[in-house]
């Protein structure tokens, strides 16, 4: 049921920059990747942005969570993906001059879940992505793709804990593989 809700809320077809973009949804593999990487905490914890719970759900003003069940963590995760992450992915995809692959959609989904839309849009990776050109068959030009992915490592969140930067760089390398569609889920 949860996967159905996620996919129903995530389907969208639109045209931008002369490119008709089809269904914009993250894959089940992407969902599993993010959940596995974020890990589930059933009790609230402090991070760089305040208190979080579940799979990195930032507890907002007016929400009160000290402890939740796994099912509640899954529900919060799906709501966050549908409410914040996929709309941000759609806004970015609308600006592209080429048809995104599922790998790019999944990579952007993971990046935005981890860095936030504002965090991502302040990077060289984002600037290069928007400047990337299409091939005659409307795919991402390989030279632009390689140039853009080289900047992916800068997409970081502030890390106060020792070793966290290495973990973030590992995640960026995995997201690069997801975008290149060479990642083995």
Q: Where are the regions a protein language model picked out?
A:
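Membrane-helix exit/interface motif
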Residues: 85-93
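Extracellular beta-sheet repeat scaffolds used for adhesion and glycan interaction
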Residues: 62-65
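Long, amphipathic alpha-helical surface segments
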Residues: 8, 18-48, 57, 68-82, ...
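Sec-dependent N-terminal signal peptides
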Residues: 4-14
């Amino acid at each position: 049921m949860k996967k159905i809700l996620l996919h129903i809320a995530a389907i969208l077809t639109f045209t931008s920059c002369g490119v008709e973009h089809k269904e914009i949804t993250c894959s089940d593999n992407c969902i599993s990747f993010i959940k596995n990487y974020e890990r589930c905490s059933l009790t609230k914890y402090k991070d760089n942005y305040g208190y979080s719970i579940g799979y990195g759900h930032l507890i907002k003003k007016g929400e009160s969570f000290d402890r939740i069940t796994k099912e509640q963590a899954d529900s919060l995760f799906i709501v966050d993906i549908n409410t914040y992450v996929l709309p941000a992915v759609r806004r970015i995809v609308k600006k592209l001059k080429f048809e995104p692959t599922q790998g790019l959609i999944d990579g952007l989904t993971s990046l935005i879940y981890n860095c936030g839309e504002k965090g991502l849009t302040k990077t060289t990776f984002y600037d290069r992505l928007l400047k990337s050109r299409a091939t005659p068959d409307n795919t991402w030009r390989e030279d632009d793709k390689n140039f853009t992915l080289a900047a992916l490592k800068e997409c970081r969140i502030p890390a106060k804990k020792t070793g966290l930067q290495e973990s973030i760089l590992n995640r960026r390398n995995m997201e690069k593989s997801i975008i290149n569609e060479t990642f083995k889920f």
